[in-house]
């Protein structure tokens, strides 16, 4: 028996290339040309196109210059931490490049005035406010399959209410219903997301697990499927307030790249989100410039190329805003050196994710 099997293997090894060619020919006849190909010949799969997140520091931390197209992205964090702001900045950046964007507002809470202030062209933004989770994900699937949408935002997973839950009564126990809905939707979506080159951003909320003795009790809604299907997961937190005299005018925000299939993960970056403005580009350029050694800081004074920018961070930000030429020079210098100094300026440590576990290597 073993001798016969050995002879079969020996015989087939002589004509492996012919056997492979016959198999590939059969697959292409059955499933169409391009069903199987050599990876190196598919140029599109080699280079992942990215859309800027609206934050210079986060673009560097992500390793590819922004959020990836043709992939699933999850942004999660506590309430009022900047999740929707970050998603809207990405939409604005995609629109600047001529992209078509859609926003599925399951929370029914999108503020068009704020979106416009962030740079979103609301006249061209497609918006849907679905009644049920099934309707939201069906709309998402149809838009992705069209191949015409560049960025699609779902805000939020927690607000995707299954139809059975809506039709039931308050207090009905329906365990795992939303998780099953998300799992089924993502199984259908992933292939068409990759083919259509659409970036789908899922915004998610945080919940607390009861009875957790060790590790973080935090978890995200919608089950585990999204954690597996997402190529990038961002944990966004508000870590401080920005004040002008006694008035709070913004938040200091920290974003951790909890998962990244396209570059080394676990980087983290901090930036300012100003009320009514969004991510403070001037604040980021100032902070990254100091960390990279491009902007000099002496006491409270900031200077660039022997020219003083201002005393104090807020004054320096105002100077940069009033002098776009200097701002552009500093930004160019940061981007040119980002590859060499990314590890120094954005060094992060392995952080526990929203389930209190260190994410495994992909």
Curated annotation (Swiss-Prot):
**Which GO cellular component does the record give, naming just one?**
cytoplasm
> Where, by residue number, does ATP bind?
77-84
Q: Where in the cell is it found?
A: Cytoplasm
Q: Does the keyword Ligase apply?
A: no
Q: Which GO terms describe its biological process?
A: DNA recombination; DNA repair; SOS response
Q: Which domain of life is it from?
A: Bacteria
Entry keyword annotation includes DNA damage: yes
**Principal cellular location given in the protein's record:** cytoplasm
Give one GO term, molecular function aspect. ATP hydrolysis activity
Its keywords, alphabetically, are: ATP-binding, Cytoplasm, DNA damage, DNA recombination, DNA repair, DNA-binding, Nucleotide-binding, SOS response
What NCBIfam families would the database entry show?
tigrfam_recA (TIGR02012)
Q: What does this protein do?
A: Can catalyze the hydrolysis of ATP in the presence of single-stranded DNA, the ATP-dependent uptake of single-stranded DNA by duplex DNA, and the ATP-dependent hybridization of homologous single-stranded DNAs. It interacts with LexA causing its activation and leading to its autocatalytic cleavage.
UniProt lists the family membership as follows: Belongs to the RecA family.
What name does the UniProt record give this protein? Protein RecA
Quote the gene name from the UniProt entry.
Answer: recA
């Amino acid at each position: 028996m073993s001798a016969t099997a050995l002879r079969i293997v020996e015989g087939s090894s002589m004509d492996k290339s012919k056997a492979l060619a016959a198999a590939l020919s059969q697959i292409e006849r059955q499933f169409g040309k391009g069903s199987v190909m050599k990876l190196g010949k598919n140029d599109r799969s080699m280079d992942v196109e990215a859309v800027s997140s609206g934050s210079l520091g986060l673009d560097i931390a992500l390793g590819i210059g922004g959020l990836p197209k043709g992939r699933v992205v999850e942004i999660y964090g506590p309430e009022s931490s900047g999740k929707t702001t970050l998603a809207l900045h990405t939409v604005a950046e995609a629109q600047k490049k001529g992209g078509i964007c859609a926003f599925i507002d399951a929370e029914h809470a999108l503020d068009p005035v704020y979106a416009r202030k962030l740079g979103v062209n609301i006249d061209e933004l497609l918006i849907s406010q679905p009644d049920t989770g099934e309707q939201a994900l069906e709309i998402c699937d149809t838009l992705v399959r069209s191949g015409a949408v560049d960025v699609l935002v779902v805000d939020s997973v927690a607000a995707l209410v299954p139809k059975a839950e809506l039709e039931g009564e308050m207090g009905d126990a329906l365990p795992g219903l939303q998780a099953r809905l998300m799992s089924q939707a993502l199984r259908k979506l992933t292939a068409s997301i990759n083919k259509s080159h659409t970036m789908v951003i899922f915004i998610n909320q945080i919940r607390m697990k009861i009875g957790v003795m060790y590790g973080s009790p935090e978890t995200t809604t919608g089950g585990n499927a999204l954690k597996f299907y997402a190529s990038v997961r961002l944990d966004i937190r508000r870590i401080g307030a920005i004040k002008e005299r006694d008035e709070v005018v913004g938040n200091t925000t920290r974003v951790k790249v909890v998962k990244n299939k396209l570059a080394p993960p676990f980087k983290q970056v901090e930036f300012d989100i100003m009320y009514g403005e969004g991510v403070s580009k001037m604040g980021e350029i100032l902070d990254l410039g100091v960390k990279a050694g491009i902007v000099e800081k002496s006491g409270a004074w900031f200077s660039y190329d022997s020219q003083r920018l201002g005393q104090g961070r807020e004054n320096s930000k105002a100077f940069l805003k009033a002098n776009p030429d200097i701002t552009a020079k500093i930004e160019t210098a940061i981007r040119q050196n980002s590859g060499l100094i990314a590890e120094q300026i954005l060094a992060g440590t392995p952080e526990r994710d929203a389930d209190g576990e260190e994410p495994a290597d992909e």
